[in-house]
């Protein structure tokens, strides 16, 4: 929808924060407070820690059968097809701080279920570490 010529997002029914009660008793949120729009990870305290990620953590080593030819070209150029990656589109458009992104390494987790890409089962924190500690193009200070 548009408001005064500017595109706006739909408004949520409920705004969540890190203290919000979630429907799973062992779930909590980690918010990236510097990104616009906000981004969050859902952390499940089981099986060594499971992170459910939106746009921030991705694991797409190669295109899937569901990507069109044009999507494959565009996404490859943007840096999407990499294993254990911090979402390049998210970094470029949401502009989180590098410290906020790197704070993921303070979490206890073994697995990542990304909304973009394949599940990372076992050793996920160590697998994402190089991307989280490396250059984060699009972050602000």
Predicted features along the sequence, with ranges:
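Cap/insert and terminal regions of metallo-dependent hydrolase folds
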Residues: 62-141
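Catalytic core of the metallo-beta-lactamase
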Residues: 7-75, 96-107
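Short internal beta-strands
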Residues: 1-4
């Amino acid at each position: 929808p548009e408001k005064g010529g500017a595109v706006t997002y739909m408004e949520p029914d409920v705004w969540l924060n890190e203290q919000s009660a979630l429907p799973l008793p062992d779930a909590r949120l980690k918010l990236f407070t510097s990104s616009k729009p906000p981004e969050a990870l859902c952390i499940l305290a089981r099986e060594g820690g499971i992170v459910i990620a939106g746009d921030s953590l991705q694991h797409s080593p190669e295109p899937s059968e569901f990507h069109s030819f044009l999507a494959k070209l565009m996404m490859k150029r943007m840096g999407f097809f990499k294993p254990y990656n911090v979402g390049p589109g998210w970094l470029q458009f949401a502009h989180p701080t590098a410290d906020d992104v790197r704070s993921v390494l303070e979490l206890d987790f073994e697995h990542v279920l990304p909304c973009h890409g394949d599940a990372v089962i076992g050793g996920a924190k160590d697998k994402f570490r190089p991307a989280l500690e490396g250059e984060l193009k699009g972050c602000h200070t």
